[in-house]
Amino acid sequence: MQAYINRGDVLLKMNRTEEALAVYKSALNYDATNHDIHYNLGVVALEQGRPDQGLQYLNRALELDPQHKEALLNSAIVIQELGLPHLHQLAHGRLLQLKDLAPENERVFFNLGMLTMDDGNLEEAEGWFKKAIILKKDFRSALFNLALLLADQDRPLEAVAPLQQLLEHHPDHVKGLILLGDIYTNHIRDLDFAESCYFRILESEPGHVQARHNLCVVWVEKGQLEAAQTCLEVICLLLFSILS
């Protein structure tokens, strides 16, 4: 049985999902109650863009082994990503169960944050994101979502610290640079720093429309109207090339 699972795992890593699917289904003929096989079938379904069926397999794995860590995590992620609010309580319970089983897994806390944020429990979500970051200081998604959560709650100055930590570890994080530039433009009013954020994006992505637009706004705020006008003309050309 383990040979089937190992072969399926290798095929899955090689992105040969149809062959992996066939191997796992063959394995079911020998052991229909093997939780790992059902879990792996769920992974294949997710890889193939069939999340509903993937969730069914993950649920079956949990029926056979209620403490299957990977199935607990991935089923909760699928529920959250599919936008199934009627199953959020189930996903929340699975993540809390997994938190006790794997207290050092930062992804558990992050996904608790995402789930509770979707449910509008913003204070609780903030706490989960912060716990995820304690466990993994360079956790890209947790740092950005914490900053975004704070900014959306009209707490932009508090969002600066997680953004700085994000950019310390991931200096080319475009969304982080956009958000930090916006905060420095509209709240801190340090236009030179905001300008530098957008230049950093444009160095690697010259055609990034939002970064260039925000740079135009900075130049208007600085009174550099000629530069701003030229900047807007460049945006028009970029949009024309995108739409044509």
Where does each model-flagged region fall?
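Core solenoid repeat modules with strong leucine/isoleucine-rich periodicity
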Residues: 57, 61, 66-76, 91, ...
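Structural signature of tandem alpha-helical TPR/SEL1-like repeats
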Residues: 13-26, 47-60, 81-97, 118-131, ...
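Residue-level recognition of tetratricopeptide repeat
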Residues: 9, 43, 77, 114, ...
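Structural marker of alpha-solenoid helical repeat scaffolds
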Residues: 30, 64, 101, 135, ...
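Helix-start (N-cap) detector for alpha-helical repeat units in TPR-like alpha-solenoids
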Residues: 1-2, 35-36, 69-70, 106-107, ...
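Amphipathic alpha-helical repeat scaffolds of TPR domains
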Residues: 69-78, 178-182, 244
